[in-house]
Design a protein with these regions (language model features):
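Conserved SAM-binding loop and adjacent beta-strand
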Residues: 1-7
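A short acidic, Gly/Pro-enriched loop at the edge of an enzyme's catalytic core
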Residues: 76-88
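A short glycine-rich, Lys/Arg-flanked "PGG" loop and its adjoining helix->strand segment in the class I
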Residues: 103-115
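Short alpha-helix
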Residues: 130-143
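Core SAM-dependent methyltransferase catalytic element
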Residues: 154-171
Length: 171
């Protein structure tokens, strides 16, 4: 199961010196590969989740990585500086955010990105369990992020999936 996650993280083209925010880290499957890549330089990873169970799980999974810190709570309530991250990762989590709160969360994530930073999002698009691609694009655009690239793919478990990269272009 690690290979698809590794390939996805490979698509980030990390040099090892980036500061990365993993929003909704859950079990740390993506986080582990990011932390590993960042060890080659002076990079750092921040893992955020609203679940204490997941934060404890990821801390155990990533205990050998000194370049990781963990934050428990809603991103809207956490003390995280704006313009602090080169990359924000949103992996299969946006559909778990209440619809009426999605724009607020995406706006906050966009503020956390440095100018020229990138937001990578992978999200199921099924009507019953996902976020439509058109909604994802609208959320990102409203937050001031510009689509660099995107594609639709298929996952055995999640069905149709949107993969996108959005840039924070300074005004």
């Amino acid at each position: 199961m690690a290979r698809p996650y590794r390939r996805y993280v490979d698509s980030f083209d990390l040099t090892g010196n980036e500061v990365v925010l993993d929003y909704g880290s859950v079990s740390g499957r993506i986080s582990r590969h990011i932390a590993e890549r960042l060890l080659s330089g002076k990079g750092h990873l921040t893992c955020i989740d609203v679940s204490n169970v997941w934060i404890e799980t990821i801390q155990k999974r990533l205990k050998k990585y000194p370049n990781v810190d963990y934050k428990l709570g809603d991103i809207a309530a956490l003390d995280i500086a704006d313009n602090a991250y080169d990359i924000v990762v949103v992996h299969f989590v946006l559909h778990h955010v209440e619809e009426d709160q999605r724009q607020e969360k995406v706006d906050i994530l966009a503020r956390k990105l440095r100018p020229h930073g990138r937001l990578f999002i992978r999200e199921p698009t099924r009507e019953q369990h996902g976020t439509p691609a058109v909604e994802i694009r609208a959320l990102m655009s409203t937050a001031g992020l510009h689509e660099r690239e995107s594609r639709m793919s298929r996952s055995l478990i999640m069905g149709e999936v949107f993969d996108g990269v959005f840039d924070k272009t300074p005004v």
